[in-house]
Regions:
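Structural and coupling elements of P-loop NTPases
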Residues: 1-221
Length: 221
C-alpha cells in the first residue's frame, strides 16, 4: 500500500508516544523514502508531554535509519476528539483555532507531488486485492503512467521478465471517502479499483497492450 502514496501521517499519543506496533509500518515508510508528518494527538489529555513524545519519535526514526531530511519532520498538535489542530502545543490557543485545517495545510506544504505522466503508455501496478461475489476479483492500485478506461483491452505482466498476456478491463472505480464510485476514466496519479481480470496478483502491472512494460514485482512481508 505504501507504494501508492506520496506521504504519511504518523499519529502518536501525547502521553504514551510511539507504540510498539508503530515501529513496523514506520520502518516501511522510511524505507520507501517517505517523510512523515508527525501528528501529536490527544494534546488535551491530562499528563500530556509533547516534548517527551517528540524526543521518543525522533529516537525511533533514528534507530530505524531515517535520513537527516526525514529526521527534520514537521509536527502538528491535535485533539481529534474535539476537532482542533495547529502548530502550537498550547491547548488554549488550539481551542481558539477550532478546526483541523493545520493538518491539511501540512499535507499540501510537505507532501511532494509525483511527476506522473498522463500521456504516456499505460502503467498501473496492483498493490492489493479485493473480491466481490458480483464482479469477482478486484485489483487496487495506482496509475503510474497514462490513462485507463472501462471496457478497454490491456496487457498484464508479472514483473519486467513476465510474458505479456491480453486482458480486458470491465469497470473502473475510485474511492470517495469510504464509498466506491464508478468512473469513465482514470489517469496517472489516481488510485483506482479495476474489475474483469481474474489473473491479477499483488505486483501485477496492467499496461498498454501495444507497448507492454512492467514495474518490478512488489515484496509482501
Amino acid at each position: 500500500v505504501l507504494s501508492m502514496v506520496d506521504g504519511v501521517l504518523l499519529l502518536v499519543d501525547a502521553v504514551e508516544g510511539p507504540m510498539p506496533q508503530t515501529r513496523f509500518v514506520t520502518r516501511k515508510a522510511l524505507a520507501q523514502g517517505l517523510k512523515p508528518i508527525v501528528v501529536v494527538n490527544k494534546i488535551d489529555r491530562p499528563g500530556a508531554r509533547p516534548d517527551w513524545v517528540l524526543n521518543q519519535t525522533f529516537d525511533l526514526f533514528d534507530k530505524l535509519g531515517a535520513t537527516e531530511d526525514q529526521l527534520d519532520f514537521p509536527v502538528i498538535y491535535a485533539s481529534a476528539l474535539n476537532g482542533y489542530a495547529g502548530t502550537t502545543d498550547n491547548v488554549e490557543e488550539l481551542k481558539k483555532i477550532g478546526n483541523m485545517r493545520a493538518i491539511f495545510d501540512a499535507v499540501i506544504k510537505y507532501v511532494p507531488v509525483r511527476d506522473d505522466n498522463p500521456d504516456g503508455p499505460l502503467m498501473l501496478q496492483i498493490c492489493s486485492l479485493d473480491y466481490s461475489t458480483y464482479v469477482g476479483k478486484i485489483g487496487v492500485g495506482r496509475v503510474h503512467r497514462g490513462r485507463i478506461y472501462p471496457n478497454s483491452e490491456v496487457a498484464i505482466m508479472d514483473g519486467p521478465d513476465g510474458t505479456p498476456r491480453r486482458a480486458k478491463i470491465n469497470q473502473i472505480l475510485e474511492f470517495e471517502g469510504l464509498e466506491r464510485k464508478e468512473v469513465n476514466e482514470a489517469q496517472a496519479g489516481d488510485i483506482i479499483l479495476v474489475t474483469g481480470i481474474e489473473e491479477l496478483n499483488i505486483g501485477t502491472t496492467i499496461t498498454d497492450k501495444d507497448h507492454p512494460e512492467a514495474l518490478p514485482m512488489l515484496t509482501v512481508d
